[in-house]
Amino acid sequence: MREKLQLIMKHLRQGSLQKMWKQTIWIYQYGRRYWKSMILYTLLGVMGSCVSLASSLISKDLVDIITGHQTGRLLSTFAAMIGFAIANLLVSQASGYASTFISLKVDSEIKNDIFAKMLVTDWESLTEYHTGDLVTRWSSDASNISSGILNWVPNLIIYTFRFISALAVVLYYDPTFALFALLGIPFSALMSRPLLRRMRNNNQKSAAMNAKMYGFNQEAFSNIQTIKAFDLIHFYTERLKTLQKDYINMRLEFQRMSILTSVLMSIVGFIVSYSCYGWGIYRVWNNAISYGTMTMFLSLSGTLTSSVNSLTSLIPSAISLTISAGRLMDIVEMPQEDYSQDHAVKLFEKQHKTSGIGLTMKDLSYTYHSGTEVFAHASMEAYPHEIIALVGPSGEGKTTMLRLILSLLRAQSGEFQICAGSDHNQKLNMSPSTRKLFSYVPQGNTMFSGTIAENMRNVKPDTTDEEIIEALKLSCAWDFVEKLPDGIQSIVKERGGGFSEGQAQRLSIARALLRKSPILLLDEATSALDVATERKVLKNIMQDTYPRTCIVTTHRPTVLNICTRVYAIRDKRCEVLNEVEIEKMVKEF
């Protein structure tokens, strides 16, 4: 007893029990949404238990009629047995269908909810997790939660009802037989203790290892070209073998413990079963019970044992549930983005749709969570019909600046606002809500699988073919698209497959232009274009009648002389370059 108290106190000090309780409450918040489905599933399960119990009783009567221990109508009893067998089949199938239907519904709704919460989670916090880990949590852990919500409490009620009803019948006919049937319970509970102690730790390690392997596979398949180019095939296959070996060793260590426990519990089960069988034979030999009663006892003995085992199995299921809940809580309880300005931004955009929207930044400072300071008192401005260039060495903060503009990152101090009006005095603070005012073309290939037209309509579902072609012309992509056999219906493979890097960039720019957002952000989005095409694309954007503000980051100064202003990001500030400095950069390039 003293050791148990010490163990409980140890868990309390470590916070394990409080954590499990918090995780249980979190699961309950989801579970109460589906109480009607849980009641339906429970009623079907209880009904099935009742039909099964009735079948055992009728089977007893049928055996006794055949052996002459009981008088009655053989045909009617046999018909009743068949009827209950059919009823059991129908209830079982109905329960299975309801379980599948409800499980799919609950699983999809919970995954949608978790997915939506992940998307509005603070971006910098979310990047602390590997995408493979996030996908594993969203898919495996969310499925575990949905399955547990539907099954755990209903099964607890169903198995308990099955156990109590079977025990009541056995006690009515022979209390001693019930004692034999229940002999295995304390042994099962005792032997399951060491397994349960290790189970939570093993489940945590297993979930982490699954996420690690998923992330490895995802990165490998996404970078097959690089793996081949650097002749890293052997290296990556060996890394996979190492990960698999670690996973196998971890699982086998736990499995050995499980096998030992299972063997011991099976031995106890055999002892209990044969004890019941021997006691039944003894009672029949003494004419204390009939053959039918003995067959019923043996049947109900199995029901009692299976019910206890099922109830015991709910414990590791609960442990697995709380672990999955904890892994999901790690994500959904991160800081959430604030979209309270949605309505204000919508009105702002409507009011200034014809005149355009720009942005102003004053004395902005930003430091990453890691402690790296990127900006200190930086200032910048960009207005409609302007092309603003951001230049500077790699790692100085150009991409970070665009993330701040998109409110993916939040500055610690300073003013950062969108602006409009003739003197730019109408302003609204930057927030996640202002993202709808931006079109963003990031570095790299951002095209999705599907046709060119489908890619364009991802950002504007109701756009016409003519509008798509016009956007392609602005980005200089129509030059090659019109030569394709299927035109805008041509297939784009995964990661822009089937098109060169420069072509994919022009398609990405066309998609951004098609959205008709007031502000366009191009992050090295013309790096794969030749100088002439790059200049033509930017000039087309400038000459477009739509009042657009354009901000580009670039390492190539060859287009700087067509930009309205050029900001050099250096020494944690944004400094406007004069014409002499720009010309010097162009000559030195």
What do these predicted ranges mean?
Residues M1-V51, T67-A80, S95-S99, S103, ...:
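Membrane-integrated ABC transporters
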Residues Y28, K36, W123-E124, S140-I149, ...:
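An intracellular "coupling" helix at the cytosolic face of ABC transporter transmembrane type-1 domains
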Residues G31, S99-T100, L119-I164, S222:
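Juxtamembrane loop-to-helix connectors within ABC transporter transmembrane domains
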Residues R33, S37-C50, A54, D61, ...:
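Transmembrane helices of ABC transporter permease
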Residues N112, A116, D330, E415-Q417, ...:
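ABC ATPase nucleotide-binding domain helical subdomain, centered on the C-loop/LSGGQ "ABC signature"
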Residues L232, R256, L304-M334:
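Cytosolic ends of transmembrane helices, especially the final helix of ABC transmembrane type-1 domains
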Residues T400, S439, G444, N455, ...:
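ABC-family ATPase nucleotide-binding domain "signature/switch" substructure
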Residues L406:
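Helix-to-loop junction immediately C-terminal to a conserved catalytic motif
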